[in-house]
Amino acid sequence: MKEMNRREFLTLSGAAVVALSLAGCGGGSYAPPAPAAPTGKEAKVLEAINKYREPLPPLTLDSGLDPAMKIVVKIAKGEMKYDKKAVEALGNAIVDYNEVGAPIGIVFDHDTGYMMPVYVYSEDVEKMAQNLLNAEDVNLKSPAITLVNIQTFEYNGTTFWVALVAKSKK
């Protein structure tokens, strides 16, 4: 057996301690932290959407759709026309997701070529859920949808909300 000097011994024993400590704390099975719970207006809209979806499982708020949502809000506010360029930008923003639905809360105005916001934000969750029932949004009723991104914004003195839904991340 080879004799070790002090430096080799300390190096080897230090490596062994690190290996044992990692094994003891389950270093190989790291679970990422749960996503932060939504707060504020987006939380109320999410609650209304999940009421509308009952008895389907609740949707999970996903911040990865933020870049696409910024484009949707610009379109809803009339700051960006819904054209080939907008469609391309949205396509690039949702590339990491499977089956992203059409934006919820805006409709196309055939006269102007712009999208218009339709869902007014309310502190009353029941009213927002009722508005969804009146609109019968097919995207939200799909059991395959699991993720949502919600944005509220001011337009002409009124607070509106829009949402994007997706089946999953790729």
Report each predicted region and the residues it spans.
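A well-ordered secondary-structure block
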Residues: 91-170
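Short coil/turn linker and secondary-structure boundary residues
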Residues: 4, 40, 82, 120-123
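Residue-level marker of positions within ordered structural domains that often coincide
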Residues: 14, 74, 155
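Short, well-ordered surface patches within globular domains
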Residues: 32-100
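N-terminal secretory signal peptides and thylakoid transit peptides that target proteins
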Residues: 1-23
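Generic low-polarity alpha-helical segments
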Residues: 9-10, 53, 128
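Bacterial signal peptide processing site
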Residues: 26-28
